[in-house]
Amino acid sequence: GLPSRAKTDHIPWATFTDPELAQVGLTEAQAREQHGDKLDVVRFHYNHNDRAIAERKTRGLIKVMVVKGRAVGASIAGHQAGELINLWALVLANNLKMSQVAGMVSPYPTIGEVNKRAAGAYFGPKLFESNMVKRVVGLVQRVLP
């Protein structure tokens, strides 16, 4: 047969403790070792999710390791982490962009919305630290009363 190597970086694992733990792809340490300064780490805390607040399950964190706009790993500690990691497994398996995850529409209010918000958090610093955006905002502020 032909030599082949199975791709396994998109296979998630979960530990059903309290809180649940889940991981797919590279951990932060592995991503930092492989990608160095190209790595961005995005964090989103459950305490900013309305469903988590309503259910009093606000202890939790999702962390996504991103290189050049694409996730290379995700770690989740919190309520339903084993369910939430599925989206990131799909993202890694299909090499999806963070913009595609951020553009997804989730029912409101759901815990699953933390995935979308984590993806959206990737763009915050990019947008507000951009010199181009700063120049445009400065121009608009001078023109508008």
Predicted regions and their residues:
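Flexible, glycine-rich terminal cap/loop adjacent to redox cofactors
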Residues: 4, 11, 16-27, 32-145
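Glycine-/small-residue-rich beta-strand-loop submotif within the FAD-binding core of flavoenzymes
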Residues: 1
